[in-house]
């Protein structure tokens, strides 16, 4: 069953960008053209800080757990950390496998880049790691005060990447699927690591 799930996820990631048509460029063009200093500043802030948030949260959890000698918090930090790092590594591999051109490069007359990226477009690494962070936190702490901010955060990251002109809708959808999928895999990996490190 797990093999079939992995097959369908990989198939989705390879085929989706190939099937995407001009509707994606039009959607990015629409979002990319939103006016106002708030949306510009908010989007820029979310995009620039996402990698630091994704890595910083599990590191802070680990530091606090170590200082307080809280083994459960250390286990949680390991789960969140492996989810984020594993997702990022997988996303980078898929990026160069698919090698999709960025929206602002493919449609320079239609989409204005608010930021510039050097790697390929699909999937969105920012969205993938944000979803990995949010999903792992929600699995470990299934409370409304964790779930609600997490949902707002991942939505903001996904939208900001399209506003910046650096991703298509299927890029962020692929990133979201990858983040959730890798986190589920990390859930089982962290169980094995916990036995080796803490038991």
Q: Model-found features: residue ranges?
A:
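Positively charged n-region of N-terminal signal peptides that target proteins for export
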Residues: 1-5, 48, 143
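Sec-dependent N-terminal signal peptides
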Residues: 4-14
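N-terminal transmembrane-helix/juxtamembrane module of multi-pass inner/ER membrane proteins
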Residues: 12-59, 92-119
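Membrane-helix interface segments
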Residues: 38, 71-75, 142-146
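Interfacial segments of alpha-helical transmembrane regions
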Residues: 64-89
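Short helix-capping/hinge motifs at transmembrane helix termini and TM-loop junctions
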Residues: 67-69, 98-99, 164-165
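Small-polar-interrupted transmembrane alpha-helices in polytopic inner-membrane proteins
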Residues: 82-96, 148-160
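Membrane-embedded catalytic cores of phosphoryl/pyrophosphoryl-handling enzymes
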Residues: 109-199
């Amino acid at each position: 069953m797990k093999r079939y799930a992995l097959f369908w996820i990989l198939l989705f990631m390879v085929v989706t960008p190939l099937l995407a048509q001009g509707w994606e460029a039009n959607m990015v063009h629409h979002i990319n053209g939103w006016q106002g200093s708030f949306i510009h500043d908010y989007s820029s802030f979310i995009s620039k800080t996402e990698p630091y948030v994704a890595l910083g949260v599990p590191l802070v959890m680990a530091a606090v757990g170590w200082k307080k000698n809280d083994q459960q918090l250390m286990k949680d930090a390991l789960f969140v950390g492996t989810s984020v790092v594993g997702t990022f590594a997988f996303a980078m591999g898929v990026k160069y496998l698919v090698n999709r051109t960025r929206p602002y490069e493919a449609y320079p007359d239609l989409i204005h880049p608010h930021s510039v990226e050097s790697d390929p477009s699909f999937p969105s690494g920012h969205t993938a790691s944000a979803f990995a962070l949010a999903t792992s936190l929600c699995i470990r702490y299934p409370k409304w005060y964790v779930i609600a901010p997490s949902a707002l955060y991942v939505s903001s990251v996904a939208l900001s990447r399209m506003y910046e002109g650096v991703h298509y809708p299927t890029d962020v959808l692929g990133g979201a699927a990858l983040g959730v999928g890798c986190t589920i895999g990390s859930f089982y990996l962290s169980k094995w690591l916990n036995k080796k490190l803490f038991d």
